[in-house]
Amino acid sequence: MTPRAAARAAAACVLSLPLLAWQSPAGAPERLHGGIVRGPTAERRIALEFTGHQFAESAAVILDELARRGGRASFFLTGEFLRTPAFAPIVRRIIEEGHYLGPHSDRHLLYCDWTQRDTTLLTRRAFERDVEDNLRAIDGFGVPRASVRYWVPPYEWYNAEIASWSAGLGLVLINFTPGTRSNADYTGEADANFVSSQRIYESILAREREDPHGLSGYLLLLHVGAGPGRADKMHSRFGELLDVLAGRGYRFVRVDDLLR
């Protein structure tokens, strides 16, 4: 399965799940299959999550828009991303500007089956090696292992066993909060599941209106790049989105601040 086909399968699986599965008291993080999918909802705080593996064409715009507004975000990058020389300036900027840097697996492997989620597709040792290699790549940028606590699994797809193995490494597995189409910003115009930036933007604001807690505690996931298959880049709406949400009283914080 190609990375793009795998991502399509992930989106279909996630979007088929009922939102009621994530409801919890306002003061507690919400969990699914052992992973955190939403932070406390008592305050108007949002944790923006950005994952990256092969592409990074949106990263500079994202960082610029955050810097203009004094916002903080969290970036989860694979080892392959971190070892790509062309991406090194982006990684250094993420760190220098005070954002969180965490792992997203080393090689972006599929950890569990799409249709039988409880079926893990690799051994515990292979999993640990993959994550540890990613952590070493992060350490290569001067971010010590002790400062890395939260991580997002590849394809944003995992099961309870993967969450448990993560805890064995001293890591807390987190994912994105369902209810918007933000994570579909990787889809290309030629894909059957393409979601335009306008639809993504509208879905986020619709969720803010409809959820009893708005977007408080949200883990809102986007990508640092979608590649050449998508001309309609979501980063063109990112600054506008930040302004609208800030106007409604939201602050943009790192995941370790939201979940501490």
What are these regions (language model features)?
Residues 17-22, 68, 244-247:
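Generic detector of low-complexity/intrinsically disordered segments
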Residues 10, 17-30:
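Bacterial Sec-dependent signal peptides at the C-terminal "C-region" and cleavage site
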Residues 1-11:
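Bacterial N-terminal signal peptides that target proteins for export
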Residues 27-118, 132-149, 233, 244:
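Active-site beta->alpha N-cap acidic-glycine motif
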Residues 61, 85-86, 108-221, 225-246, ...:
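Catalytic domains of cell-wall/extracellular-matrix polysaccharide-remodeling enzymes
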